[in-house]
From Swiss-Prot:
It comes from the Eukaryota. A motif (RxLR-dEER) lies at residues 30-50. It is found in: Secreted; Host endoplasmic reticulum. The keyword Cell membrane does not apply. Keywords: Host endoplasmic reticulum, Secreted, Signal, Virulence. Belongs to the RxLR effector family. The keyword Secreted applies. Effector that suppresses plant defense responses during the early stages of pathogen infection. Suppresses cell death induced by effectors and PAMPs in plant hosts. Avh262 stabilizes endoplasmic reticulum (ER)-luminal binding immunoglobulin proteins (BiPs), which act as negative regulators of plant resistance to Phytophthora. By stabilizing BiPs, Avh262 suppresses ER stress-triggered cell death and facilitates Phytophthora infection. Residues 60 to 82 are required for the interaction with host plant binding immunoglobulin proteins (BiPs) and subsequent virulence. Residues 34-46 have a biased composition (Basic and acidic residues). Residues 24-46 are annotated as: Disordered. Disruption phenotype: Leads to reduced virulence on etiolated soybean seedlings. This is RxLR effector protein Avh262. It comes from Phytophthora sojae (strain P6497).
Length: 123
């Protein structure tokens, strides 16, 4: 019981010796944040300039349409119940090629996450 009393006395002396907490540890004044700083360090999406090469994206879409049409002509259904591993691998390889050609065109979090799982990954 004696050590607890000693600790309480020391704490009481320390608190009463300082007139206020702000003298012991002054807090910095906060400045008002600008509109862009409140949202984070990123700029507004509408203010961003993106260079999108529509040729590579349209080429990929046209290649996929050709594959679908070839499957339809061969007698396969347009929407198979499940995709085979070979189908997933072939589409993933094409996507990897396109993403490696123009990585800034594709949205990084979504496409790279799927590509890493599908065909060896993209850095």
């Amino acid at each position: 019981m004696l050590p607890v009393a000693v600790v309480l006395v020391v704490f009481a002396v320390a608190v009463t010796s300082a007139e206020s907490i702000h003298q012991v540890n002054p807090l910095p004044r906060r400045r008002r944040l600008k509109g862009t700083e409140e949202k984070g360090h990123h700029t507004n999406v509408n203010d961003e300039e993106r260079v999108i090469s529509l040729e590579s994206a349209s080429d990929l879409i046209s290649k996929l349409k050709v594959k679908i049409n070839a499957k339809l002509l061969a007698g396969d259904s347009a929407k198979p119940a499940t995709l085979s591993k070979a189908q997933v691998a072939s589409v993933a390889k094409e996507v990897v090629k396109e993403v490696k050609k123009t990585p800034k065109v594709w949205p990084p979090p979504m496409i790279k996450k799927g590509v890493r799982r599908g065909a060896g990954g993209v850095r």
